[in-house]
C-alpha cells in the first residue's frame, strides 16, 4: 500500500514539471534589426582588417621599390668612383691630356633627359716597354734589350690566357721628353721574344673617342717612348632603350630605358662590350675641377675667393677664365670629377593618392642636376639622388718596380 502511494506521488510531481527549453520555450529569437547590426559590426571589422592589410602592402611595395633604386645608385657610385680614381694610372704623366674626355648633355638618347658621358684611359696591368725603334709602315715596334724579361706575360692569346700578349689593347707613346703630343692605339697581333718586337693593328679610327691622341708623327719621335697596356672605358646612360648603334642582346646591350652602363673596348671584336651597372637610372651628370690653366693653383672658376662645389665646370664650359677645352692643358689639369646619379622608381608610388604638391615636387618629379633642368610634371615616381666627388689620385702612380713613370 505504501509503495503504491509513493509511486502516485512521483507521477504527480513529474506531471507538474515544466518542459525544458530544449523542447519548447516561450522566449522570442533575434529580430531582423539585431541581425543586421551584428552583421554590420562584423563587416566593419573585416573591412578594417582588409584596409589595414592593403595599406601595409602598399607601403611594403613602395619601400621595396625605393630600396631597389637605392641599391642600384649606390652600386653605380661605387664602380664609378673606383675607376675615376684610377684614371691614368701607370701611364706617362706627360700625356695626361689624353686620359679622359667628357660629353656634356649627350642627346643621342633623345629628350626629356640629356645625360653626360665620360670616357677615360687606365692601366691596371703593369707594362712599360721602352721603344728602340718604330716602323709605322708595318706597325712593328722594337724594344730595348731584355724588356720582355721584366714582365710575366707570354706569347699566347688574351683573354684565354690572362697573361697573354696577343689581342691586348696597347698605346704607343712617343718620347715624353720631346713634348710631342702623339700616340697610337692598337691591339697586339704577334710578339717575338728573340727580336724584342711586337706587331700591332691600329684601332685609332675604330675607338669611339680619339682622346686627343693625334696618331702618327715622325718615327724617330717614338725612340725612347713606351708601350703600355690600356683599358678604355665609358660610363653612360641609356635614357630610352634605343641608343644609336645599340642592338638588343649584342655586346651586352639590354635595350631597356634607364640603364646605366660601363662599356669597355674589346680589341678582339673591335667594339664596345657593355655591362649594365644599374637599372632605373633617370639622369647621370659629370662636372670637373682642377688646375686647368696650369698656374699651379686650383681654379676659382666663379671668382668668389672660395674653392667649393660651385667651381666645378661642365665639360666645355669656359668659366670665368674662358677656358678653351681644345687646349691640352685644360683636360690635363683636371684633378677632381664630381658625378651625380639620379635613380627613379620603376613604377609610381601606389601608396600616394592625389597630385603631389609643389613642396614635394623634387621627390616625385625630376629635380635640376648640374646643368640638367628640372621637370615641371610630378609623375609620382620617387627619386633618389646621390652625389660624390672623386679625386684622380692615381694619375702619377707608378705601378712598376723601376722607378717613377
Segments and roles (model prediction):
Residues 1-30:
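N-terminal leader/signal peptides at the extreme start of proteins
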Residues 2, 11, 60, 135-137, ...:
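Short secondary-structure boundary/capping segments
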Residues 27, 68, 75, 91-94, ...:
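Short linear sequence signals and composition-biased patches located at protein termini or domain-edge surfaces
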Residues 28-89, 391, 397-403:
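Aliphatic-rich helix starts adjacent to a transmembrane/signal segment
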Residues 42, 169, 185, 338-339:
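Beta-sheet entry/capping signal
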Residues 52, 56, 257-258, 288:
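A short secondary-structure junction motif
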Residues 55, 132-133, 350-352:
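Short, solvent-exposed loop/turn and secondary-structure capping segments
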Residues 107-211:
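Autoprocessing Asn-cyclization modules and mimics
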Amino acid at each position: 500500500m505504501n509503495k503504491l502511494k509513493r509511486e502516485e506521488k512521483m507521477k504527480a510531481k513529474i506531471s507538474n514539471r515544466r518542459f525544458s527549453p530544449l523542447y519548447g520555450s516561450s522566449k522570442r529569437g533575434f529580430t531582423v534589426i539585431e541581425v543586421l547590426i551584428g552583421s554590420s559590426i562584423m563587416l566593419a571589422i573585416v573591412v578594417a582588417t582588409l584596409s589595414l592589410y592593403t595599406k601595409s602592402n602598399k607601403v611594403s611595395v613602395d619601400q621595396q621599390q625605393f630600396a631597389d633604386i637605392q641599391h642600384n645608385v649606390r652600386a653605380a657610385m661605387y664602380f664609378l668612383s673606383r675607376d675615376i680614381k684610377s684614371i691614368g694610372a701607370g701611364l706617362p704623366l706627360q700625356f695626361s691630356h689624353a686620359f679622359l674626355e667628357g660629353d656634356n648633355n649627350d642627346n643621342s638618347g633623345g629628350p626629356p633627359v640629356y645625360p653626360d658621358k665620360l670616357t677615360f684611359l687606365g692601366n691596371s696591368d703593369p707594362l712599360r716597354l721602352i721603344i728602340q725603334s718604330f716602323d709605322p709602315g708595318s706597325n712593328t715596334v722594337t724594344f730595348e734589350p731584355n724588356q720582355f724579361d721584366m714582365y710575366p706575360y707570354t706569347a699566347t692569346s688574351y683573354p684565354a690566357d690572362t697573361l697573354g700578349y696577343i689581342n691586348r689593347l696597347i698605346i704607343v707613346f712617343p718620347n715624353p721628353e720631346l713634348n710631342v703630343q702623339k700616340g697610337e692605339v692598337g691591339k697586339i697581333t704577334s710578339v717575338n721574344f728573340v727580336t724584342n718586337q711586337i706587331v700591332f693593328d691600329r684601332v685609332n679610327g675604330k675607338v669611339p673617342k680619339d682622346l686627343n691622341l693625334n696618331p702618327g708623327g715622325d718615327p724617330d719621335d717614338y725612340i725612347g717612348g713606351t708601350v703600355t697596356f690600356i683599358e678604355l672605358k665609358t660610363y653612360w646612360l641609356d635614357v630610352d632603350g634605343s641608343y644609336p648603334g645599340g642592338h638588343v642582346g649584342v655586346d651586352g646591350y639590354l635595350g631597356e630605358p634607364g640603364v646605366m652602363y660601363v662599356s669597355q673596348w674589346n680589341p678582339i671584336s673591335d667594339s664596345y662590350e657593355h655591362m649594365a651597372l644599374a637599372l632605373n637610372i633617370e639622369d647621370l651628370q659629370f662636372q670637373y675641377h682642377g688646375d686647368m690653366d696650369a698656374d699651379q693653383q686650383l681654379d676659382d672658376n666663379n671668382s668668389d675667393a672660395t674653392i667649393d662645389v660651385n667651381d666645378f665646370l661642365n665639360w666645355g664650359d669656359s668659366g670665368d677664365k674662358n677656358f678653351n677645352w681644345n687646349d691640352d692643358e685644360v683636360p690635363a689639369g683636371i684633378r677632381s670629377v664630381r658625378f651625380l646619379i639620379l635613380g627613379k622608381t620603376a613604377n609610381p608610388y601606389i601608396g600616394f593618392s592625389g597630385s603631389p604638391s609643389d613642396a614635394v615636387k623634387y621627390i616625385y618629379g625630376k629635380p635640376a642636376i648640374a646643368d640638367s633642368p628640372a621637370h615641371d610634371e610630378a609623375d609620382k615616381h620617387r627619386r633618389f639622388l646621390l652625389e660624390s666627388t672623386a679625386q684622380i689620385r692615381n694619375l702619377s702612380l707608378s705601378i712598376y718596380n723601376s722607378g717613377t713613370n
